[in-house]
């Protein structure tokens, strides 16, 4: 029985690790994200099983400023079962917020932090994340998002995996504070790609993750 549980846990870890903010020890990860408000790029290295550290660039298209930050992520807790995995992360960053696109603002300190949590089997997924950002005169904002989805088929290791998801996004400071985004996720090997469309504000969503 224990051998079967260990095999199942190892398989879940190998198939689900691609989307994780903490990779395997010694691994590098590149993450790109673009949603209704901002676009970002993160390159991080995983020095230990419970932490990654990287550099993140974020461009806020609505308010014409960018954030350049050091970005650590801590894996606080991981749960394994015979057919599921759950994770709890703390993430944050500190750096500089700078004006772009003729915004006359000056450089100011930016700091942010939040939590991420997810639970999934080979066919079901639920996730939550939030972040509070303080960037001087540029922004003081909170966001949170809940995501749920399912896999229309269960692939084996090395196959192309497909997920259909819905994300509910809440940003209290925005005029459209709550929005809905249906999306599709594909991953195979070290590459994960997500594409969707925000039905509330008519904006595309595109994310990718690549592990080295």
Give the residues covered by each predicted segment:
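Cleavable N-terminal export/targeting peptides
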Residues: 1-22
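Short amphipathic alpha-helical segments
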Residues: 2-3, 98-100, 207-212
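Generic hydrophobic/packing signal
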Residues: 11, 89-91, 181-183, 205-207
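Outer-membrane pore/translocation modules
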Residues: 18-181, 191, 198-199
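Outer-membrane beta-barrel "beta-signal"
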Residues: 72, 148, 184, 202-212
């Amino acid at each position: 029985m224990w051998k079967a549980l260990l095999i199942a846990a190892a398989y879940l870890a190998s198939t689900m690790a691609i989307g994780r903010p903490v990779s395997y020890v010694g691994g590098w990860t590149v993450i790109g994200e673009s949603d209704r408000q901002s676009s970002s790029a993160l390159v991080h290295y995983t020095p230990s099983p419970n932490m990654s550290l990287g550099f993140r660039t974020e461009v806020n298209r609505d308010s014409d400023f960018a954030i350049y930050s050091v970005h650590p992520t801590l894996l606080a807790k991981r749960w394994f079962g015979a057919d599921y995995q759950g994770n709890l992360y703390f993430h944050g960053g500190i750096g500089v917020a700078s004006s772009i696109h003729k915004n006359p603002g000056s450089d100011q300190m930016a700091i942010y932090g939040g939590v991420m949590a997810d639970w999934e089997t080979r066919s079901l997924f639920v996730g939550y994340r939030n972040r509070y950002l303080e960037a001087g005169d540029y922004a003081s904002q909170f966001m949170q998002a809940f995501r749920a989805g399912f896999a229309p088929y269960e692939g084996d290791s090395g196959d192309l995996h497909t997920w259909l998801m819905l994300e509910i996004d809440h940003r209290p400071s925005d005029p459209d504070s709550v929005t809905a985004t249906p999306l599709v996720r594909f991953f195979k090997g070290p590459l994960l790609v997500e594409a969707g469309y925000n039905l509330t504000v008519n904006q595309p969503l595109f994310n990718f993750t690549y592990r080295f």
